């Protein structure tokens, strides 16, 4: 009888020890990454732009991205993200004169 009680207590202890303990029992932490932030990508006075092609970025239809906090992948969707020189004092992109470099995502 003592053997059965010992076996019962040991099995209950084993089940209690193996049960998850409120949250991640292996101390893993969930890390979410939305995408690449565009703020540190461009330099030398260039601005991030979304262009409709990646083969030749001169003369393309490019739109400037005014908010740098939006991840590039969400802002451009299926278009190509590029760093382009601004064409005028207002920051508009002139496609024929713009020197654009594609951003690898």
Curated annotation (Swiss-Prot):
Places the protein is found: Secreted; Secreted, Cell wall
Lineage start: Eukaryota, Fungi, Dikarya, Ascomycota, Pezizomycotina
Extent of the signal sequence: 1-18
Gene from which this protein is expressed: HCh-1
Highest taxon in the source lineage: Eukaryota
Protein's name in the database: Class I hydrophobin 1
Source organism of the structure: Davidiella tassiana (Mycosphaerella tassiana)
Disulfide bonds, paired cysteine numbers: 42-83, 50-76, 51-62, 84-100
Family membership: Belongs to the fungal hydrophobin family.
Keywords assigned: Allergen, Cell wall, Disulfide bond, Secreted, Signal
Subunit structure: Self-assembles to form functional amyloid fibrils called rodlets. Self-assembly into fibrillar rodlets occurs spontaneously at hydrophobic:hydrophilic interfaces and the rodlets further associate laterally to form amphipathic monolayers.
Function: Aerial growth, conidiation, and dispersal of filamentous fungi in the environment rely upon a capability of their secreting small amphipathic proteins called hydrophobins (HPBs) with low sequence identity. Class I can self-assemble into an outermost layer of rodlet bundles on aerial cell surfaces, conferring cellular hydrophobicity that supports fungal growth, development and dispersal; whereas Class II form highly ordered films at water-air interfaces through intermolecular interactions but contribute nothing to the rodlet structure.
Major localization listed first in the record, in broad terms: secreted
One term under GO cellular component: extracellular region
């Amino acid at each position: 009888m003592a053997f059965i009680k010992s076996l019962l207590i040991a099995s209950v202890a084993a089940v209690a020890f193996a049960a998850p303990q409120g949250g991640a029992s292996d101390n893993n932490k969930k890390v979410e990454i939305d995408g690449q932030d565009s703020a540190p990508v461009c330099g030398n006075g260039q601005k991030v732009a979304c262009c409709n092609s990646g083969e030749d970025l001169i003369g393309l239809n490019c739109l400037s991205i005014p908010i740098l906090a939006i991840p590039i992948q969400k802002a451009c969707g299926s278009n190509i993200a590029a760093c382009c020189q601004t064409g005028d004092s207002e920051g508009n992109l002139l496609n024929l004169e713009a020197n654009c470099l594609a951003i690898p995502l």
